[in-house]
């Protein structure tokens, strides 16, 4: 038996779905959630897992994602992800550098890291699809982040980070403000660096959608 449930799009990712969605999620063995706003960090998803439901969340998924990263060999994705996680678990500190000037470092607390392998096979498990990254909280990250190409705010150039929070932003020459600065002013909490991860899905390509881009092998 299967059932299709539609509901009005909420305002933000992580917003709770309206009734009867949470109760419906607990009634089935598997929930596949191709939504515009993510259900991953919701009580509805957590309660469904407690009831034994396997949940796959696919926020903002589109045809291009269906035809690329979702068709990956997920046993291979799992192998790469587990190896990457193993390297992280053996490390005390991570340092990220790029030719354009990025230089960031932070301590590794492996207990905060999650292996997003795409394997959602046991009762009560959940995952974000397409999958392919070990990710976690970069404790007290410090340094400089250079934005080579950032479509959301093309005028932004360099971000200074101290103790896990953005403290300064430099724009391209001749430009006084950026969309990123406006976002920081509107949502002060968005200055906090909440996640570090790197992609482990060989079939994921950069398309301008975070759901897939963060899973691309090499990012």
Where are these regions (language model features)?
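B-type heme-binding environments
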Residues: 157
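Cysteine/selenocysteine-centered motifs that mediate thiol-based redox chemistry or coordinate metal-sulfur cofactors
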Residues: 189-219
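Solvent-exposed, well-ordered loop and adjacent helix/strand elements within mature globular domains
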Residues: 174-196
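Active-site bordering "gate/hinge" segments
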Residues: 1-154, 162, 171, 175, ...
């Amino acid at each position: 038996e299967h059932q299709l449930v539609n509901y009005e799009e909420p305002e933000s990712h992580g917003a709770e779905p309206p009734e009867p969605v949470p109760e419906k999620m607990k009634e089935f063995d598997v929930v596949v959630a191709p939504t515009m706003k993510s259900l991953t960090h919701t009580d509805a998803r957590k309660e469904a897992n407690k009831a034994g439901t396997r949940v796959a969340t696919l926020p903002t998924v589109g045809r291009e994602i269906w035809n690329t990263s979702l068709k990956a060999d997920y046993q291979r994705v799992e192998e790469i992800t587990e190896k990457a996680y193993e390297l992280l678990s053996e490390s005390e500190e991570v340092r990220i550098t790029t030719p354009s000037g990025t230089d960031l470092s932070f301590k590794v607390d492996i207990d905060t890291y999650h292996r997003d392998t795409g394997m959602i096979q046991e009762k009560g498990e959940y995952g974000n699809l397409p999958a392919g990254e070990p990710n976690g909280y970069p404790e007290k990250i410090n340094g400089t982040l250079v934005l080579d190409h950032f479509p959301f705010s093309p005028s932004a150039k360099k971000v200074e980070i101290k103790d896990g929070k953005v403290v300064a932003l430099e724009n391209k020459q001749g430009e006084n403000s950026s969309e990123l600065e406006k976002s920081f002013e509107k949502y002060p909490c968005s200055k906090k660096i909440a996640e570090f991860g790197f992609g482990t899905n060989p079939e994921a390509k950069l398309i301008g959608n975070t759901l897939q881009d963060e899973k691309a092998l090499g990012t």
